[in-house]
Amino acid sequence: MPPESGNWLNNPHADDLDFQIEADFVGLMAPGMVQQALEIADKVSHIMNSGDGFYGGAFVGGLYSAAFIENDPARILDMALEGIPAESTFYQCIDDVRKLHKKYPRDWKQCWFEILKKWGSDTGCPKGVFLSFDLDAKINSAYVAMGLLYGEGDFGKSMEIATRCGQDSDCNPATVGGVLGVMLGKSGIPAFWREPLDEIWDLDFEGTDVSLAKGSLYSYNQALQLIEKNGGKVSDMEVTIPTAPVKVLPLEQNFTNTYPIFRDQKDAWMEKEYEFDFSGNGFCIWGNLVCLRGISKGYADRVSKKHVGSEVFALAEEADPYVAEIEVWIDGELDQVSILPMKGTSRKLEPAWKYLLPEGRHSVKMVWRNPDPSQYLLRINAIQYYSENPVKDVYYHN
C-alpha cells in the first residue's frame, strides 16, 4: 500500500517514469493552479514512485497546469520546476537543461550530449543499470524540457526534438505535445496533427465506454469543480481561476549510499534453489516466472538472450492462477518470502532485492516453497550489486 509501495526500499522502479507518463491529468484538472497540481501529485504518485519518480509526475502536472495561463514554454518550464526541491537530483538535471539551453540556444544536440553524459546512468531499474536503456524520470523529463525549450513553441519541431532525444521516446513527445496543446488551444494545433483525431474523436477506447470526446468532457468538468473548490468562480461565459504561491515539495532522494558497482549476467534457471555471493551493501535480481506450457525451456532461453531478458514471458499468461513462493535467505537468515504471480497483470519482474545491508561479503540463497518444474521455472536474467562506495569505469560483466 502507498506510500510503502512507492518507496525505493520496496520498489526498484521508484525513480522510474511510471507516474510521469500518467500525470497529464494532474495539470489538466488544476488549470493555472500549479500548487493544487503539486498537492494532487503528492497524493497519487506514491502508489508507484517516490523521489525523482515522484518529482517527474509533479513536474509534468505543473507543466500542464502552467500552460493554461502562460504562452512562453520557458516560463511554463520555470513555473513547473518551482515546487521541486533544488537539492534533488531531479531539479538539478532539469536545471542543467535550462543552463545548457542558454549556453547553446541553437544546438539541442549539444545539450542532449551534455545531459546524457552527466545524467544518463540508471541506478535502480534492473533493465537499465549499466545498459543503454533508461527509464529514470529525470533524464526523460530532461528530454521533455529540451523539446519545449528548443522547439520554441513550434508543435511539430518540439515533438521531433523530444522524440529524437531517445529513451522513452513515445511518452516524452506525447507530454510535449500535450503541454503545447494546452498552451496553443485546439485551434492553434497545426492541422497536420489535429485533423486525424477528428476521425476517432467519438470512438470508444477498446474495452471501455470512454472516447476522446467523453474523456475531454470528464476532464473539463473535473477542472471546473476543482476551480470552485479552491475559491474560483465559474459562470456560463467566464471562469476565474484562483492562484496561490507554490510551496516546495518535501525532499525525497532514493538510493542514498547505494551505488551500482557490477552487473552479473546470469542467464540461469531456478527449479528449486539458487545461491550466490557478493561484496557490497545490496543486490537486485532481474528475472521472472516463466510458464512452460506451449514453449520449451530452450526456446525461452534463446528469446531471453535475444531480448536481454525474459520479460516477454511474464506478460504472456493472462489467466494463470499459479503464484510462486520464494524464500530469500541472506547470510543464513530468512529475510523475505517473495510472491511471484504468473498472471500477466500481476507480474513481478524482480524475484528479490535488498538494499542498505552492512557493507561487506554476503550470501544469498533462494528456496522455492511450491515448485512445479514441469510447468514453471524462474528465470534469472542478471543480478545488479550495490555498494556504499561508488566506483568508476565498471559497466557490464557477462
Task: Identify what each model region corresponds to.
Residues 36-44, 58, 197:
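Short, conserved phosphate-binding/catalytic loop or strand-edge motifs used
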Residues 306-390:
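Beta-strand-rich ligand-recognition modules
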Residues 4-14, 23-33, 42-47, 62-166:
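Accessory "access/gating" subregions that flank catalytic or transport cores
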Residues 20, 37, 56, 73-76, ...:
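Stable alpha-helical elements in mature extracytoplasmic
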